[in-house]
Amino acid sequence: MESSVNGVDSLSEVQNSVSGVHHHDPLPSGTPQPSRPPLRASRNYDGGHQTKAIHHHNSHVINQKHSHQEGKTLKQEGLPTKLSSKQPPLDDSKGCEPNGVLESEKKRVVDNHGKNYSQPDATFCASPQNSFYSATVYSEAKESFTNTEVSECASVDKSCESEVANSSDFNESRKTSICRASTGSDASDESSTSSLSSVLYKPHKANDIRWEAIQAVRTRDGMLEMRHFRLLKKLGCGDIGSVYLAELSGTRTSFAMKVMNKTELANRKKLLRAQTEREILQSLDHPFLPTLYTHFETEIFSCLVMEFCPGGDLHALRQRQPGKYFSEHAVRFYVAEVLLSLEYLHMLGIIYRDLKPENVLVREDGHIMLSDFDLSLRCSVSPTLVKSSNNLQTKSSGYCVQPSCIEPTCVMQPDCIKPSCFTPRFLSGKSKKDKKSKPKNDMHNQVTPLPELIAEPTNARSMSFVGTHEYLAPEIIKGEGHGSAVDWWTFGIFLYELLFGRTPFKGSANRATLFNVIGQPLRFPESPTVSFAARDLIRGLLVKEPQHRLAYRRGATEIKQHPFFQNVNWALIRCATPPEVPRQVINLPQTEKDLGVKPSGNYLDIDFF
């Protein structure tokens, strides 16, 4: 989940401080409203076909700073050898957000999407007609499609906030991200946040038993508080908080609870980052992204209750592989799901900026979930339908270029086209006699190409210095300003590390690594052996000039059309068999030593170039 961080509180301090605090009023009074479970009554099925009502919103999410009392610190206490599940009632009504109500309570988006068939041994998948790619990914960017239009070429007008780098915080740890420009100047422009409105109903988790458990407790006790959860184990800690395995009292459901000390966040000027992460989590509804079940605040802590992934992260899983690298088949599975996650985020105007194996978690069914959004950048995006010319189809790549109805696994031939996906208006008006005289390789002339959806925030610009040293894009290191192309650079580094067991530009120290990223060419080791397609994809992604980088203009669509993914059925990717399914046994710590995580304490201020 998140790695070591300076100033992390122990598990007992979280629970003991909550039980013994006297409430003051650090924030304007209000009532925090957690996210609600999706209503099954809103799901509408008719013969296997689903309908979706998309409501467009033009309202904005206004960032508001919290007012916190200074000087409140946690009392250092010894860790208990046995965690207690008994906690006194806690009134958090005085420690909520200034507005008191989540955006999700104000905006209802009824989204009757298909079920998430993510069981590793499932024998049934939704039919391609019901789950082809345009229905499973493109339509999920519900509230960001405010200005979708059809044009002859991509006409994407995007704007984003500019962040000024005033200070530097670096961590020598490989697992900890670095962040500069946390002074509060990285607030999003109000006009760029309309796509981040909270989604009340999340169809991808409609049948999740965790929703039922939360609803049962809420019906019985009202608002969820810290007393309703029993913290079992510390899973990890990061720059703005610690993550615990938590069990909802009276149920057998487990969650991952991120606990953040509000006083420390205020002192380190990280409140805005915590708020950004919460708002992003509220807006997500995707099979490979986390679900925020609820969130609440005490006088001291801000807590996010999310999905728990028992499989750990891909970094730990890679360490257990022979040679400490994955097979190419396994890599293709993991990076394909990560690619869809990044595509969805970009459609919402979210640049992730922190992709690395440590942030890719493995669910209980073996599929992945992207985590940690506190470094993400929010910006505006204008999804555009672009008419594709026949020239795009006849280029020498030798693989299909159209998503949705054209199978990506074969060359443009008659048997590649699904007749059910086309209506007569897509066919040419020539007679059958003329059509029969056409050779097979001219089939593309008979079909009007489907438009492509371009939703890449290419004009987004930020001056922040954020990320992990080995994954930083050259434009970030140079301080030239960066946009969505940084996610495709990190995607290339991520692909390289999974295939070869190490990153391509790692130096003897962090400073040497940064110089290698800027000045050293990309090299591949002799072992292990990987396919030409994999190397070619990495070369396209790790181009140092962002404007020449693969996916710079057309986003994930370009990458999905690469030969490396030619055997991927994007429509049914959730039904694919994972390379490895984690064991369901959770080993809980038994001693204080197992629970304690010491802060790294090695933050440095470094001037680059």
UniProtKB/Swiss-Prot annotation:
Protein's organism: Phaseolus vulgaris
Listed Polar residues bias regions: 1-19
Name of the protein this chain belongs to: Protein kinase PVPK-1
Ranges for domain Protein kinase: 229-565
EC numbers on record: 2.7.11.1
Amino acids binding ATP: 235-243, 258
Keyword Kinase: yes
PANTHER family the record matches: FLIPPASE KINASE 1-RELATED (PTHR45637)
Active site: 354
InterPro entries according to UniProt: Kinase-like_dom_sf (IPR011009), Prot_kinase_dom (IPR000719), Ser/Thr_kinase_AS (IPR008271)
Swiss-Prot/TrEMBL catalytic activity: L-seryl-[protein] + ATP = O-phospho-L-seryl-[protein] + ADP + H(+); L-threonyl-[protein] + ATP = O-phospho-L-threonyl-[protein] + ADP + H(+)
Keywords attached to this entry: ATP-binding, Kinase, Nucleotide-binding, Serine/threonine-protein kinase, Transferase
Homology family: Belongs to the protein kinase superfamily. Ser/Thr protein kinase family.
One Pfam family of this chain: Pkinase
Region spans: Disordered: 1-51, 80-100, 429-448
